[in-house]
Swiss-Prot record:
Record's protein name: Small ribosomal subunit protein uS10
SUPFAM superfamilies per UniProt: Ribosomal protein S10
PROSITE patterns for this protein: RIBOSOMAL_S10
Organism: Sinorhizobium fredii (strain NBRC 101917 / NGR234)
Entry keyword DNA-binding: no
Gene Ontology biological-process annotations: translation
Recorded GO CC terms: ribonucleoprotein complex; ribosome
Length: 102
């Protein structure tokens, strides 16, 4: 794959699982002879939800919940066919969303 890059974008709610998956991808790519740029930590998206604590009274009593989406970006430079095969066979954690662009 001459002059081609693979861009991998990872998303997860738990940053520990995300970092472990990132380390696994980086080690697999380096083992097969490709060079890796990253991981680049992208901004964390924080969604906040405010709800009433009580079902019908006490408007002033509220509770807040938040959902954090952590993201990482990896670039694999000049991947070999072995790199692509190894990445396809890689089994990552269940809570990690992977987007791959060639």
């Amino acid at each position: 794959m001459n002059g081609q890059n693979i861009r991998i974008r990872l998303k997860a709610f738990d940053h520990r699982i995300l970092d472990a998956s990132t380390r696994e991808i980086v080690s697999t790519a380096k083992r097969t002879g490709a060079s890796v740029r990253g991981p680049v930590p992208l901004p964390t998206r924080i969604e906040k939800f405010t709800v009433n604590r009580s079902p019908h009274v006490d408007k002033k009593s509220r509770e807040q919940f938040e959902m954090r989406t952590h993201k990482r970006l990896l670039d694999i430079v000049d991947p070999t066919p072995q790199t692509v095969d190894a990445l396809m066979k890689l089994d990552l954690a269940a809570g990690v969303d992977v987007e791959i662009k060639l």
